[in-house]
Amino acid sequence: FSAQPTSVRWIGNERGIAGDPVWHKVKKAKITDDVKNEYLNHGDPEGDMYSVGEADVSIRSGWFYHDNQQPKSIKDLMDIYFKSVGRGTPLLLNIPPNKEGKFADADVARLKEFRATLDQMYATDFAKGATVTASSTRKNHLYQAGNLTDGKDDTSWALSNDAKTGEFTVDLGQKRRFDVVELKEDIAKGQR
């Protein structure tokens, strides 16, 4: 990354943590050699250019391989995932090769565990096809509340044009136990 404005920016830390909130816009004039990390971490809702904040972190405590280091725990990786991808930023996870130019067995095992944990987390969508009611809906069938649970990435719900806030309720049909809720913003229509 550089001090020049680009469509992808460093998130401002090497812990893999995006700001909350994080905006995918910045003001071109602020991206200079002395830009503040806090500004990079959050972006700017009034920015004049699109610039995705990319969260980067190493699977180990440093960027290079050392025999005496172990990969981060699955708990730590999941925390990083929720504080990067969960906040709408891509995660660049560094895997340093060992002195033979290969990935360490412990790192490969942790990556597989990480993938399996993510797959398990997203395996069951209790809300898919569930009934949804909303406080407001745009008068266009393209943005109906039922789109929230249709399982499609190319549909979305939108408030009526005059609404500033809104809410929706998803009826799962029965009691369900879960610990993760995934909400996606229709970025094609702008970040809000």
Located regions from the model:
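Mature catalytic domains of secreted/periplasmic carbohydrate-active enzymes
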Residues: 1-149, 155-162, 182-185
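Short beta-strands within extracellular/lumenal beta-sheet-rich domains
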Residues: 160-174
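A short beta-strand element within beta-rich, extracytoplasmic domains
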Residues: 176-188
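Short, surface-exposed beta-strand/strand-loop-strand elements in extracellular ectodomains
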Residues: 190-192
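Short, solvent-exposed loop/edge-beta patches enriched in aromatic
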Residues: 85-87, 174-177
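Residue-level detector of short, conserved catalytic/binding motifs and their immediate flanks
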Residues: 89, 168, 179
